[in-house]
Amino acid sequence: SGKYNNKFMPDDARFAAYFKNTNPRIQAQAKRFVNDKTIDATKAYQELAKEHGISPVTLAVAYSKHFDFIASTIIGARSASQLEESFAAFDFNIDNELMRKIEKIQGDILYPMG
């Protein structure tokens, strides 16, 4: 949705509350998922989505539904527009060229879990 494009996120963002939490474990988890590496990856995925005329949310949901071994894709939305972006993924298919670009980003900027 663009909320986490840099380290200055809106006060109502979920991770903003995690960073302000006094529990060191919660802060550590927040830093694991919102850091320079993940912000760089987010920017790369946003640019890729823009190149294909879709929102980053649509790209993420389309990526999840692309794999037949994923039984279901769980989405979350705070607004009707976010829900519409998720639903747009049902009309969007990831072709081989786009998948190669996604995999390049994944190779260049590794997922924070591994």
Give each language-model segment a name.
Residues 1, 49-57, 108-114:
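A short, terminal or domain-edge coil/loop segment
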Residues 80-83, 88, 93-114:
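Extended hydrophobic/aromatic segments used for targeting, binding, or gating
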